[in-house]
Amino acid sequence: LSILFMQQGKHVLCEKPLASNAKEAREMIRVARQNGVTLMEAMKSTLTPNFRQLRRHLAEAGCLRRYFASYCQYSSRYDKLKAGIVLNAFNPELSNGAMMDLGVYTVYPLVVLFGRPKRISATGLKLSTGVDGQGAVNFEYENLNATVLYSKIADSFLPAEIQGEK
């Protein structure tokens, strides 16, 4: 729908994540440029006053060594999936796995703060529909290790944390 609206000259604020894959994102960007409209992803957590404060004070922690973030929230639709009813939240055609729905909230701040990692390794649990129900991703940077956890099939109340040498 975003492409359709941009072709009609409309600016688009697109729900996160912007696209299901890089090919789709490139096409959306191409259409936005071609039509002289703004395409913006609605990922606002890294644009909040709290995040700006975090960035402002991050150096006070010294040399940063660890980033940890967790977003695990049992989906109200998971019980239906276990009963054999596939709702949008677990439909692979809509790219609605746990990473695309919740995991992005752990990864975006990491990439905004530290950029592209040197190496990434991941593990996850696929559900009957083929989407990921949960996962863990490790990101390796020059002097920092980062781990994110995400899930739509379990709850967690672990906080996010950035550790430095101070």
What are these regions (language model features)?
Residues 15, 70, 163:
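Alpha/beta-hydrolase-fold catalytic nucleophile elbow
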Residues 8, 34-35, 60-64, 116, ...:
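Structured helix-beta-strand junction loops
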Residues 1-43:
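Beta-strand-loop-alpha-helix segment that lines the small-molecule cofactor/substrate pocket
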Residues 17, 43-46, 126, 152-154:
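Structured beta->alpha junctions
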Residues 107-166:
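Contiguous beta-strand/loop segments that form the cofactor/metal-binding neighborhood of enzyme cores
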Residues 45-120:
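Predominantly a Rossmann-like dinucleotide-binding segment in NAD(P)-dependent oxidoreductases
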Residues 21, 74-79, 156-158:
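A short beta-to-alpha transition loop/helix N-cap that caps and shapes the active-site region
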